Amino acid sequence: MYTADAHCDALLKIAQSDSPLVNIDTLKKGGVGLQNFALFAPVESSIYEQQEMIKKEITLFHMCVKQSDNLHSNPFTFIKNDNTYTDAILSLEGAGMLGDNLDMWNDLKNKGVEMASLTWNERNNLAAGSSQPNRYGLTRAGKKVIQWQNNNNIVTDTAHLNEQSFWQVIELADTVVVSHTNTRALLDHPRNITDKQVAALVNKNGFIGLTFYPLFINGTNRADFSDFGRQVEHLCSIGASDIIGLGSDFDGISSTINGLSNPSDYPALINWLLARFDENIVEGLVGENFRKFWNRRRIKR
């Protein structure tokens, strides 16, 4: 079954000379036809160090694509329902190192970035992250960047934003996703989203990627397929079945769902889901919803 993942941190792992869970071999074994690779630089680093890390990860991304026949990247083509290879998307997770420098934003776009979030968990010069009080939201610079994203058909990722920033993005941005999150109805965690936020994303024709991080799923260090299934069941019950998908956060989380250690384990998850949900729901969840969302975005070019 065609599989797509809206978020992983493999590029940071490679940049730090570590072996990523998301790699050519595991993507192929898992039948992954579409993978978003996030550019991320630790926010405790200096602005210069963050900028250099992002440059390094961009170079590594294009090197990986060039060296592998199984990894394709072309922001100007439609994504086919074909998992004999993996279409690779490039995104930016946290943009404090760019601020509202539009020359730098244009440079990232020219290097293939198609989606970006304004901040990580912290408050920066653009927005407030999920660890911040809701009295903080988008800054004037952040609103300027949202307008630039609209003008350049860049998807705005609201993962890691606090609620105040989220609602401002919903009001201002044309194309919105939450690339990796879970539902707050089942676990009240600031990185999870409320049913009201889910409804806003449905109305916006957005996308929600579900993580495999137990701490966001059930608040512990251990979760299994049934815990993940409850996330899916709840979101389907409130009308979100057409906009939910996978947002694994592989290579960015310290633990994952039991039996789902890397992308090669996706067939086991799919088989478990097929035994409990309608096939069309499972097809949408594991890949088709994200693929269709991305093609709707690319048709605007």
Predicted regions and their residues:
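Histidine/acidic residue-rich metal-binding segments in metalloenzymes
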Residues: 100-110, 132-177, 190-204, 226-242
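Structural preference for beta-strand elements that scaffold enzyme active sites
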Residues: 2-5, 34, 87-91, 114-115, ...
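An N-terminally biased module of ancient metal coordination in phosphate/nucleic-acid-related enzymes
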Residues: 1-36
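Conserved, mostly hydrophobic/aromatic
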Residues: 7, 27, 112, 156, ...
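Mid-to-C-terminal alpha-helical segments outside catalytic/metal-binding sites
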Residues: 261-301
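Short acidic/histidine-rich active-site segments
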Residues: 239-260
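Active-site beta-loop-alpha junctions enriched in small/polar residues
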Residues: 7-11, 40-42, 91-95, 121-123, ...
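A metal-dependent hydrolase metal-coordination microenvironment
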Residues: 26-103, 130-136, 140-143, 147, ...
